[in-house]
Amino acid sequence: MTDAVWNERRLGEDKQRRNDHRSPYQRDRARILHSAAFRRLQAKTQVLGVGMNDFYRTRLTHSLEVSQIGTGICAQLKQKQPQHNPLLDSMSLIESLCLAHDIGHPPFGHGGEVALNYMMRKHGGFEGNGQTFRILTRLEPYTEHFGMNLCRRTLLGILKYPAPYTNLCVGTPEESVDDFRQLKPSKWPPVKGIFDDDREILDWVLAPLSQQDRAKFLSSHVVKDIKHKRTRFKSLDCSIMELADDIAYAVHDLEDAIVMGIVSEQQWHTDVSLPLSQSNDPWLKNEFATISQRLFSAKHHLRKDAIGTLVNGFVTAIAITEVDGFEEPLLRYNAALEPAFHEALSILKQFVYKYVIRKPEIQMLEYKGQQIVMELFEAFISDPERLLPLNTQERWLAHERLGENSHRVIADYISGMTDGFAARLHQHLFSAKSHSMMDFNSDF
């Protein structure tokens, strides 16, 4: 398929700007970087709660690091496999995807996501990646109705789970809980896909594909111990972004945890160093002993050097592989880690999950955020024309008039909030101590 088709935008543009020689993907990158949705990431939870420590990473700093790693992957792939350079011609495209990948995540991380998914259980569900697609294509007010109006290839690249909700949802929703405080996240896992409300935009993104490619790309399968079906494929650009995200999550969130004293050297030795000392890869086997020493060093520069060495190890272990059965080159090729490094990254991610994410103090913050989000949603849906800010009321009324999913408007409003704004609004609504007016139409 020609570049021209993948460079198309849903809304035709004829911007006559003086001496503007930027590529389509440089424009996409600028739109993302200057958006309100991107700015709000500075006050949204990454792993450690906002306010726990001045050192922690927010979703904004995480996204910047993912972008840096993503362009690093792209650069080394160009050198390692120059025959694929025509497909990897734009660093700005990869930057755009990495900067935008978390834009749809709600306040309070996974707690907020589970809360919104529960409140939307009869109205198409909620999931952060689906909301990212929705912000980019509908909600961000760069245009009136087309979001940021990004290129088709950029939207293809943001699709981590390229299938609609109804194709992936398994079974009927669980019984509602009697009290929000009883809600268990394990009972309400989000369906990872595109909301049915945005299905026609997904169709537009995939329009250049052959019928065979489209059917294969949209296919899904059952994964052991996961309630809902999962998609099986992603584009080349998305595979690079996802690897960069995984590396940043495993390595940089580990750094936060070490600095803040959340994990110990003994835990690291038992769960990471020992398993990797058995690796068949000589780099992993030889380097990890010195990496471990430097990671837990009291000297900041030694720890930073260890983090840099880890990131470099993963980035240089990535190659482009062929995916059977696709005609479109953007789908036929994916970036993938060498098996030994894939296993090493899985071990690191499991370590962060076990000792950081599942830590009771972190789970308490998630639980608190979960309650805040559900109670805000309950309040707004009880009387939208009374409690929603005026611009959101207008959207809600328009959806009601057209017979569209008005619950989605409330999910859009709450998911766009920062952690701090949601907490203040909750206090304003439910605490007797709150007496001041709030500016509901502010940019959170």
Curated annotation (Swiss-Prot):
Sequence ranges assigned to domain HD in this UniProt record: 59-250
Keyword list, A-Z: Hydrolase
Species assigned in the record: Shewanella pealeana (strain ATCC 700345 / ANG-SQ1)
Top-level taxon in the UniProt lineage: Bacteria
Family annotation (SUPFAM superfamilies): HD-domain/PDEase-like
Homology family: Belongs to the dGTPase family. Type 2 subfamily.
Name this polypeptide is given: Deoxyguanosinetriphosphate triphosphohydrolase-like protein
UniProt-listed GO biological process terms: dGTP catabolic process
Disulfide bonds: none
UniProt KW Hydrolase keyword: yes
GO MF annotation terms: dGTPase activity
InterPro entries the record matches: dGTPase, dGTPase-like, dNTPase_2, HD/PDEase_dom, HD_domain, PHydrolase_assoc_dom
UniProt cross-references to Pfam families, sorted A to Z: HD, HD_assoc
Region (Disordered): 1-28
HAMAP family linked to this entry: dGTPase_type2 (MF_01212)
Keyword presence, Acyltransferase: no
